[in-house]
Design a protein with these regions (language model features):
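Short, contiguous alpha-helical
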Residues: 262
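C-terminal structured domain segments across diverse proteins
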Residues: 329-330, 334-588, 604-606
Length: 606
């Protein structure tokens, strides 16, 4: 309650001060104030000291696109010690690449934290490749953590020196995916569910019908986890000079090693306290006079410097547009964390008609969603591809509707651990008949045609109505696989075999012909430049343009911290939050026909 009041008061205070400022000095004065702040920002911005170490916080949540911050949230960022832990993939990649060439940067420190990152493994794969390139440039990487988990260790294993606290541990216990089923709860509260679907592996409807995984869903999930776990082992092993068998043995025999056991197994290089690793970094950088520690700069601060350097070298006439499609695909404009069909289609049209944009990279990180919205976007992708190269870069997941919007491009890149496929269609129909009856509610209807009230939630659909909806689902599925066959130049009968709603890893998708290349966002950008014959003479522009004028103002502000960072969630609260996220997915189901092309609900891999 105390933290709630602090954040609420801070939000109200920020709003009040903003209004007071505007009322006192007027709009012109405010603009002048902003201009002065902008002109002085170069002097007050971050600086890199000679022989500094770039610090990458392993708890950062690496996303594709910039997070949208509400005004109140942005004010909280200013007042808080914690400005948020989200950072874009391109920010991380560009910073590491700049640091590799920067004579003032002598190494990278991967800083562990008690907070765990929620970054997807496909994004981590590309960051890891960038770190490996940094190491290959003969610049050292140090990594330290109290307790190493698999996600952090995936990056940490690339380091020249991996250290763990004497009382710490290292976890390598394999991947798991645990699904939540709502069937019992829906029955308890009187909510009815009916489904129509095509594809025996299209398991998105299972949480609402079953109480456990179907054999088909278990089979596909096991294969997917096996592919991703295999990629993990073959990636981590070589840097540590341990075999896949040795790593698997760790996972099969408890999965958690104490510090001394991790050292004995050659999975870490040192068992030390933080002050000891800091002393080692001081030997590399010398002592910073201000903070008495090693000379350092955080990745977020360094990114600001790297961005300023890039903007001065930009070629405005030769642009490669990176359009982000991140989140649930929904009909209409969509919210800030959704892929709105109309909004993204409009962005693609704008890019297509911009003569300065010579090529497009569509970055997809979506489980799918509305079939209608997916087709709206897919059409614009296809039209743009006829005018200029469109390259798709699949992120952590590009499944079902996410694949639909990708397949019309000129070339598709995916990481080995991208989750894709799920070529299937379903309809999900809720009714509140029992819930209403239990609470004394009734309905009556007057209609002019037999199917006039087919969209009502007052009763279940009758057999004729279900047959009509199933017919629509069947037709959309047939169109889906036909589009896949045409765009991927595959026989339709082969597409029918590999579709059925089944999810695939990027590696498997490449073997099946669903993607063209194994690679990340940087590879896709390079391919776009190659197809557009731009050489090195181009500038990258990101879409949609998300940062508002108001946010730019707030980002310039600095002040004394009056708030504490948000506390880490306890396990029970974290589990409740997961359940809320599962249920929130239902709110995004707004297809006008009630037909969806979507991955299994909130597939989680831990």
């Amino acid at each position: 309650m105390k933290d709630f009041l602090k954040y609420t008061c801070a939000s109200l205070l920020g709003t009040f001060l903003g209004l007071l400022l505007l009322g006192s000095i007027g709009l012109g004065g405010l603009v002048l104030l902003i201009a002065l702040a902008a002109s002085s920002s170069k002097d007050s911005g971050p600086q890199v000291k000679d022989k500094s170490v770039l610090v990458l916080d392993l708890s950062l949540n690496i996303t594709d696109s910039k997070p949208i911050r509400s005004p109140s949230a942005a004010i909280q960022d200013v007042l808080s010690d914690d400005p948020g832990n989200a950072v874009t993939l391109r920010t991380v990649l560009d910073s590491i690449e700049s640091a590799k060439k920067d004579p003032k940067i002598v190494g990278i420190y991967l800083e562990g934290s008690s907070d765990s990152s929620s970054s997807g493994f496909a994004n981590l794969k590309e960051v890891r490749s960038a770190l490996q390139s940094f190491r290959d440039a003969k610049k050292p990487i140090f990594a330290y953590q109290m307790d190493w988990n698999e996600r952090d260790y995936y990056l940490g294993s690339v380091a020249n020196t991996i250290a763990v606290n004497p009382y710490g541990s290292l976890e390598i216990n394999g991947f798991s995916s645990q699904a939540m089923f709502f069937t019992g709860a829906l029955e308890k509260y009187g909510l009815g569910v009916q489904v129509t679907r095509v594809g025996k592996y299209k398991s998105a409807v299972e949480p609402f019908l079953l109480t456990k995984m179907s054999p088909e869903n278990r089979q596909q999930t096991q294969k997917l986890l096996g592919d991703m776990w295999g990629e993990y082992l073959t990636t981590v092993g070589p840097n540590r000079k341990v075999t896949v068998g040795q790593l698997q043995a760790v996972a099969d025999n408890g999965g958690t090693l104490m510090a001394d056991e991790a050292l004995k197994s050659k999975l870490v290089d040192k068992v030390v306290y933080f002050d000891e690793i800091a002393a080692e970094l001081k030997k590399l950088t010398g002592t910073d006079r201000e903070n008495k520690s090693f000379k350092q700069i955080s990745l977020k601060n360094y990114a600001r410097i790297a961005e300023d350097k890039k903007s001065t070298l930009a070629n405005k006439k030769n642009q490669i547009a990176v359009l982000y499609a991140e989140g649930e695909i929904v009909d209409g404009e969509g919210g800030p964390t959704e892929v709105g069909g109309d909004r993204i289609a409009q962005e693609m049209r704008k890019i297509r008609e911009d003569d300065d944009v010579k090529a497009v990279v569509l970055r997809v990180n979506s489980p799918g969603g509305s079939a209608t919205a997916a087709e709206v976007i897919g059409r614009e992708v296809m039209l743009t591809g006829k005018k200029k190269p469109v390259i798709v870069s699949m992120g952590n997941l590009a499944a079902s509707g996410g694949y639909w919007i990708s397949m019309g491009s000129n070339r598709i890149f995916a990481e080995p651990n991208t989750i894709t496929g799920s070529i299937g269609v379903f309809g999900m129909l809720f009714n509140a008949e029992k819930l209403a009856a239990n609470n004394g509610l009734t309905w009556d209807v007057v209609k002019t045609a037999r199917f006039a009230d087919i969209n009502t939630v007052s009763r279940p659909k009758n057999p004729q109505e279900l047959a009509n909806i199933q017919r629509i689902v069947d037709r959309i599925y047939d169109r889906f696989i036909t589009k896949v066959a045409d765009s991927r130049k595959l026989p339709k009968n082969k597409v029918q075999e590999i579709a059925q709603g089944r999810v695939w890893s990027g590696t498997a998708a490449k073997q099946l012909g669903l993607v063209d290349e194994i690679g990340g966002l940087e590879d896709a950008v390079a391919e776009a430049a190659k197809q557009a014959k731009l050489g090195d003479n181009w500038q990258l522009e990101e879409y949609p343009k998300r940062r508002s004028f108001e946010e730019q103002i707030l980002a310039r502000l600095s002040g004394v911290s009056v708030l504490k960072p948000a506390a880490k969630l306890d396990p029970l609260t974290a589990e409740v939050k997961k359940m809320q996220e599962e249920l929130a997915a239902i709110e995004s189901m707004n297809d006008p026909q009630g037909i969806y092309v979507r991955l299994p609900f909130n597939l989680r891999i831990d």
